[in-house]
Amino acid sequence: MNNIVHKLKTLVLNEAFGGVLLIVCTLLALLVQNGSFSEHYREFLNLKVGFSVGEFELNKPFLLWINDGLISIFFFAIGLELKKEFLHGDFKNPKNIVLPFMAALGGILIPAMLFALVNIGDAYTLKGWAIPTATDTAFALAILMMCGKHIPSSLKIFLLSLAIFDDVGAILIIAIFYTTKLSIVAFVVAGIAILAMLILNLLGITRKSFYFICSVILWISVLKSGVHATLAGIITAFFIPMQTKNGEAFLEEIYESLKFWLAFVILPLFAFANAGVNLSNIDIGAVFSGVSIGIFLGLFVGKQVGVFLFSYLVIRFKFAALPQGSNLKQLYGVCILTGIGFTMSLFIDGLAYEVSDIFNYADNLAILIASFCSGIWGFIYLKFFAARS
């Protein structure tokens, strides 16, 4: 009996199995949204959930709690893993930061340029230039994990590092180009929460409850500031101490405790809530519009070309080195996966075009097709053409 339980636990904690579950939830969301349960699906996502303390009230749809709340925990975990790499891993050398930073920059500039070239002359459609610049880290990482031992672990760290810069870029784009109102008061409160965590860290305090309270205050203030709340998860991670005063692995303990919830609750729920695009309303005739073509070219072509080109240049001119144990073929495979814009691209699409059906949902279809093509081609390439010998 114990042997069976052990095997089940091993399967459940297997990252590749988690990736499969993520894809299943994506397909399930598409089926539900386009089936007889579509109304219940929308009611579930629009259900208001909230709380109030005195005059303060936070009452938002369930979808927001998933996208801005639960997914912040995902970015918190990414931040924890990156901190380990910065302090004890490859990124202890500042030179190793150059590659993911430049890769992310290429993954923003080239897709935006392609979209702009296709839609030049139309001021309204050009508002969507940032749609193909995004990468859905959760899905890209899930596909990468499904490749198993075919690629070195250093490429996983490269993708995570690239994703941080990519997300920061997306947040800056949203804040500068798609945010109409920013709250200075909320920024001040966020600064106080960050200062409190810095003091806790410097004093070597490892009470989880203290960091939890500060992180909640930070999350709420970032949410109210007008900036995407997921940034709070990344910031919080950087202030978690590596170990207790007794030398126990504090950060590692927190990271390990999150693995199960991330792989089998948070990320599947995130996929189910965001992948439900209504395909019945899509006008096939609009599929070949400038917006759709720009999005597809930006995500499927622009992302992989931009990320790989900028990566190759900094490696070629010796400003950076390839991730340890990898080669250019494997690096290119990871670059393909950055074209999975999916939920983040859908999010920016909603900000860029306030009228959701202005293009008869062809823009949403373009995001789905480009993301699926990037995921499928990236998986096939990494699994069969770039396998480690």
Curated annotation (Swiss-Prot):
UniProt keywords, alphabetically: Antiport, Cell inner membrane, Cell membrane, Ion transport, Membrane, Sodium, Sodium transport, Transmembrane, Transmembrane helix, Transport
Annotated membrane topology: Multi-pass membrane protein
Transmembrane segments: 12-32, 62-82, 97-117, 128-148, 157-177, 184-204, 220-240, 260-280, 282-302, 305-325, 331-351, 365-385
Domain of life: Bacteria
Keyword Ion transport: yes
Subcellular location: Cell inner membrane
Family that this chain belongs to: Belongs to the NhaA Na(+)/H(+) (TC 2.A.33) antiporter family.
Name of the molecule in the record: Na(+)/H(+) antiporter NhaA 1
Organism for this UniProt entry: Campylobacter jejuni subsp. doylei (strain ATCC BAA-1458 / RM4099 / 269.97)
